[in-house]
Amino acid sequence: MNRQAVKGTQIIAIVAALAGWLVPGLGHLVLRRWSKAAVYFLCIGGLACAGLAMRGGVFGAGAEDLFNRLGFFADLGAGVFYFLAHQIQTAGPDVAHATGDYGTRLFAAAGMLNFLTVLEAYDIGRGGEAK
């Protein structure tokens, strides 16, 4: 493969990874993996929405301790769901019930799962998986 083709492949892989982070499944959609894109969007979106429906907390950027920083990193992985949740969450987490804690964990799990799909989209974009 010549240099130009390698550079084009790297650009496609980076664009797919960034798109996949911003909107779960969009990176696979860019790579024309229709079914994977739909499954990833529905699963990650479902986890994020379930976490918010349970009044789970969303970690902010101004974290003071390591746990909150890791929570912010995990939540940030959810892409557009994080930014929407950060804007619409006005009441705060439900700390009086266990469901609020479960919701916080579900939202963080959605973000971490999206990071895995971003890595997969990048790998596919680089030619790491048979088409």
List the predicted regions and their residue ranges.
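Transmembrane helix recognition focused on a "late"/terminal membrane span
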Residues: 1-17, 40-131
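Membrane interfacial helix-start motif at the N-side
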Residues: 5-9, 19-36
